[in-house]
């Protein structure tokens, strides 16, 4: 696309924003660090989501309850702290396609993965191995390797890393199925990312879950890049367990709380091991101070400590946005927005050392396009995009820059600015 054509395309992007406006008005958008626009073109919501405008007032309301009531706020606050986490249960269940008893919001993501693996990674005999993606987020890799060591196993031989075929960037579901069919009797746990953090590939969760369970393995999912990004139906897909964070697409703020899903078939299993604490016991008898926990037959049994109220408020505020907009509408806009960014990138990447590595099929990706650069540093390119053009993206060294057109608040003009910035920053070779 020539420069004059790119200029004309800006008008088309503005028309698309008029016809398909999204919900940007509900969020605070940071100012641009450079370029000719006042606001940043923020395409880093897959790293940290923007702050909903309602969050500040709601957080201050919880702070005011603490100031005004002290300890009495546990029962007397407008939103009493003792059952506060229950306010998140129904909207969380709707978000991930679960029954309310199957979900709870608590802790952070990797902590929850460890707590879940206490229950669901139970190596016995030859069935000891854990399957993850070769490009899994490092924290997941560290977690499963440490779980192997905890059980006295060699992590190098216990952890199976699924890699794409030579010359390809993403996994094929058929290859995952083939591995599970051929070696399933040695696999105790399959733990994959629902959307791969690096490539943006949306895994075929129902198919892989069915294949893993048919092989006799437990199947869990890290949904950090899937929750709030793509529609989920965890109960119907028969997923054993899942966990996700809330600070990316769910916009709960840096380090925001994690969500947990445990399928209802496991909830009343008395043989399932689990770490317990004060909040593991049923609420009705919690303050009887019994020395023996009486866990409820819900995902709340995986709780250990009382929840941080000031961290739960932003999650609640964000979930209200998702309830009001709906995942179906968000997904439809996401497909349109990401498709437009893909088309724009196709206009500016020819002749430049840039290649989109995210699947081209909209059904195999969420709100992310990852671009591999052929020369230079990904971090340096992301820095130039931000400082010279006000485009905020996320670099993953050594050579990937990730762009996330989040359907809640990203615009078609944001996507145009990405293409314009890349055309101005990356030279044609």
UniProtKB/Swiss-Prot annotation:
Any one GO MF annotation of this record: kynureninase activity
Domain of life: Bacteria
Residues reported in the UniProt entry to bind pyridoxal 5'-phosphate: 109-110, 137-140, 222, 225, 247, 278, 306
InterPro entries from the UniProt entry: Kynureninase (IPR010111), PyrdxlP-dep_Trfase (IPR015424), PyrdxlP-dep_Trfase_major (IPR015421), PyrdxlP-dep_Trfase_small (IPR015422)
Enzyme Commission number: 3.7.1.3
Keywords: Hydrolase, Pyridine nucleotide biosynthesis, Pyridoxal phosphate
HAMAP family referenced in this protein's UniProt entry, alphabetically: Kynureninase
Record protein name field: Kynureninase
């Amino acid at each position: 696309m020539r420069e004059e054509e790119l200029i004309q395309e800006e008008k088309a992007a503005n028309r698309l924003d008029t016809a398909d406006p999204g919900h940007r008005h509900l969020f605070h958008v940071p100012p641009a660090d450079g370029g000719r626009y006042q606001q940043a073109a923020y395409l880093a919501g897959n790293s940290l989501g923007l702050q909903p405008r309602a969050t500040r007032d709601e957080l201050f309301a919880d702070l005011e309850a603490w100031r005004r009531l002290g300890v009495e706020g546990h029962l007397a606050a407008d939103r009493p702290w003792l059952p506060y986490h229950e306010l998140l249960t129904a909207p969380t269940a709707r978000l991930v396609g679960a029954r309310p008893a199957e979900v709870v919001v608590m802790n952070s993501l990797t902590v929850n993965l460890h707590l879940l693996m206490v229950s669901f990674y139970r190596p016995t005999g030859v069935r000891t191995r854990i399957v993850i993606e070769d490009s899994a987020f490092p924290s997941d890799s560290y977690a499963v390797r440490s779980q192997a060591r905890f059980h006295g196993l060699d992590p190098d031989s216990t952890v199976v890393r699924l890699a794409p075929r030579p010359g390809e960037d993403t996994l094929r579901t058929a290859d995952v199925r083939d591995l599970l069919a051929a070696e399933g009797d040695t696999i105790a746990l399959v733990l994959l990312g629902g959307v791969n953090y690096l490539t943006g590939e949306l895994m075929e969760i129902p198919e892989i879950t069915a294949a893993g369970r048919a092989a006799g393995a437990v199947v869990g999912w890290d949904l950090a890049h899937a929750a709030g990004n793509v529609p989920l139906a965890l109960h119907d897909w028969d997923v054993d367990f899942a966990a996700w964070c809330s600070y990316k697409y769910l916009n709960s703020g840096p380090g925001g709380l994690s969500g947990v899903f445990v399928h209802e078939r496991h909830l009343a299993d008395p043989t399932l091991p689990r770490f317990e604490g004060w909040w593991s016991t049923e609420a009705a008898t919690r303050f009887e101070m019994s020395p023996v926990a009486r866990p409820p037959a819900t995902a709340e049994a995986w709780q250990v400590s009382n929840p941080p109220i000031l961290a739960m408020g932003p999650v609640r505020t964000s979930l209200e946005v998702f309830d009001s907009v709906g995942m179906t509408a968000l997904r439809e806009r996401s497909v349109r927005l990401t498709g437009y960014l893909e088309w724009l990138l196709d206009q500016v990447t020819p002749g430049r050392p840039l290649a989109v590595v995210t699947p081209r099929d909209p059904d195999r990706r969420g709100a992310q396009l990852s671009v591999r650069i052929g020369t230079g540093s990904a971090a340096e390119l992301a820095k130039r995009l931000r400082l010279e053009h006000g485009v905020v993206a996320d670099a993953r060294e050594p050579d990937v820059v990730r762009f996330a057109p989040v359907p809640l608040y990203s615009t078609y003009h944001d996507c145009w600015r990405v293409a314009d910035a890349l055309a101005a920053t990356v030279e044609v070779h």
